[in-house]
């Protein structure tokens, strides 16, 4: 007997949108078809008029715990994810303490296991801790980074020498490096030059397009020389997209798979430098808001496959922290709950096709971060039943008072969105009828591919000792 029977729905399957029914048992999709004769099931969801899609995978969140729980914690952040159709997240390391060694990793893992209602991975931080990276990899971190090439929240930025050393070590481990690409030297020079500027768009001026482009170019050269797998976080500029497109074209011409992937955020897709006046310091994030030419390049890159995925860079701060002058306010905006609804609205408005939305919010993130091996990322028999059920006709404005993050505000206030009616995680309904339907701690830790058990470590030590 199936646990859940979804009927009267439509799915995107084998390159077309078609009517279907889905049976779910023991957390997995067990059957996809039509007109099932099911005598009974624990739950029947009549999805008349709605689409059933893979739930989102957000590879870039800052859930702020430990150390900054006034802004967010694992429970509130994961509730926001579930309410927005996200069933898997990957948390970044710039917490207090940062996730840079065994102790800090195990502290964060314990908290996440106790509180998260969605499945999760944890990235390892990179500072001067090169000797700790192997240990973190074997503990099960998903990837390393984001590695900050320039100053940002948490103070984990590193210099050029350490950056190269880190990438070399990550290459040895066979791991993935995730990169925040901004040129710190350029940023500091512009900060000094513009120290009298008090306008809100000051932040875009000290981190201009050239700041990102310079860092991306430097990183691409290192990636190529070291042959390390890498992922660029939150690309935001016309210039960076052009570089990525060129490198991918050259790889394809030589019948090679690119060594890197890249992401874009909803705030760089759907907000612009024109929003500074409306948002003031609430629009401050790293990298900053960009002009219309960059936004057009991002949309084109998303459609033609240059950009691999969309991630929220959910980085919440309280209203009281953001309601300051542009220099004093911290960088970052909340976004995990609005990622999928904004992307669904973009499909509704023909900004990108549904098939591409599914690729950039689920399948591509799963592949890039090794989650496909754990059954994530696709609506197919044998995969985890991580699903969202949405009625694309239900376009509604985003309101901060309907969201679940502790931030209490959103830069997307009033913008069109399509929110899910149901979110399922491993066959459990965690969001339905506008309410959370899951207990803290039901989320599972998704071990990275470098994970080793204590037995493996002992065996490895014995083998090393006998050489």
Curated annotation (Swiss-Prot):
Cofactor binding notes: Binds 2 Zn(2+) ions per subunit.
Pfam families in the record: Amidohydro_1 (PF01979)
Composition skew (Acidic residues), residue ranges: 455-467
Region (Disordered): 439-467
PROSITE patterns: DIHYDROOROTASE_1, DIHYDROOROTASE_2
Chain sites annotated for binding Zn(2+) 2: 146, 180, 234
Binding, Zn(2+) 1: 60, 62, 146, 313
The keyword Transferase belongs to this UniProt entry's keyword annotation: no
Gene Ontology BP annotations: 'de novo' UMP biosynthetic process; purine nucleobase catabolic process
Enzyme Commission identifier(s): 3.5.2.3
Positions contributing to substrate binding: 62-64, 94, 317
Cofactor(s) required for function per UniProt: Zn(2+)
Biased composition (Basic and acidic residues): 441-454
Catalyzed reactions: (S)-dihydroorotate + H2O = N-carbamoyl-L-aspartate + H(+)
Enzyme active site: 313
NCBIfam families documented for this protein: PRK02382.1, pyrC_multi
Family: Belongs to the metallo-dependent hydrolases superfamily. DHOase family. Class I DHOase subfamily.
Function per UniProt: Catalyzes the reversible cyclization of carbamoyl aspartate to dihydroorotate.
Name recorded for this polypeptide: Dihydroorotase
Gene, per the UniProt record: pyrC
């Amino acid at each position: 007997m199936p646990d859940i029977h979804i009927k009267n729905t439509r799915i995107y399957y084998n390159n077309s949108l078609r009517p279907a029914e889905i049976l779910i048992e023991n957390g997995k999709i067990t059957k996809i078809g039509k007109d099932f004769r099911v005598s009974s099931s624990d739950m029947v969801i009549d999805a008349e008029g709605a689409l059933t899609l893979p739930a989102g995978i957000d590879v870039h969140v800052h859930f702020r715990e430990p150390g900054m729980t006034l802004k967010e914690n694992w429970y509130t952040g994961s509730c926001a994810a579930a309410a927005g159709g996200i069933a898997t997240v990957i948390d970044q390391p710039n917490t207090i303490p940062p996730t840079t060694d065994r102790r800090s990793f195990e502290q964060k893992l314990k908290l996440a296991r106790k509180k998260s209602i969605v499945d999760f991975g944890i990235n390892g931080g990179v500072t001067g801790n090169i000797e700790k990276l192997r240990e973190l990899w074997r503990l099960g971190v998903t990837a390393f980074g984001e590695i900050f090439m320039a100053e940002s929240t948490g103070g984990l930025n590193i210099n050029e020498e350490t950056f190269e050393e880190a990438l070399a070590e990550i290459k040895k481990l066979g791991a993935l490096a995730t990169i925040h690409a901004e040129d710190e030297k350029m940023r500091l020079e512009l900060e000094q030059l513009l120290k009298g500027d008090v306008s809100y768009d000051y932040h875009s001026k000290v981190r201009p397009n050239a700041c990102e482009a310079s860092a991306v170019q430097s990183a691409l050269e290192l990636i190529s020389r070291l042959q390390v797998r890498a992922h660029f976080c939150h690309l935001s500029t016309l210039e960076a997209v052009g570089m990525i497109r060129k490198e991918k074209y050259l790889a394809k011409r030589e019948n090679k798979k690119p060594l890197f992937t890249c992401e874009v955020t909803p705030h760089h897709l759907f907000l612009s430098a024109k929003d500074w006046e409306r948002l003031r310091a609430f629009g401050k994030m790293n990298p900053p808001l960009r002009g219309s030419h960059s936004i057009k390049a991002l949309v084109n890159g998303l459609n033609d496959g240059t950009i691999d995925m969309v991630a929220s860079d959910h980085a919440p701060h309280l209203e009281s922290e953001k309601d300051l002058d542009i220099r004093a306010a911290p960088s970052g905006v909340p976004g995990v709950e609005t990622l999928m609804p904004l992307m669904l609205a973009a499909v509704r408005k023909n900004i990108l096709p549904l098939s591409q939305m599914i690729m950039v919010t689920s399948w591509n993130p799963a592949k890039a971060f090794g989650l496909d091996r754990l059954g994530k990322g696709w609506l197919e028999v044998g995969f985890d039943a991580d699903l969202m059920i949405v009625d694309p006709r239900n376009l509604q404005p985003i309101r901060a008072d309907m969201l679940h993050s502790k931030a209490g505000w959103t830069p997307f206030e009033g913008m069109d969105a399509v929110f899910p009616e149901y979110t399922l995680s491993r066959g459990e309904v965690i969001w339905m009828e506008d309410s959370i339907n899951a207990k803290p701690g039901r989320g599972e830790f998704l071990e990275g591919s470098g994970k080793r058990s204590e037995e493996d470590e002992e065996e490895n030590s014995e083998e090393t000792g006998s050489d």
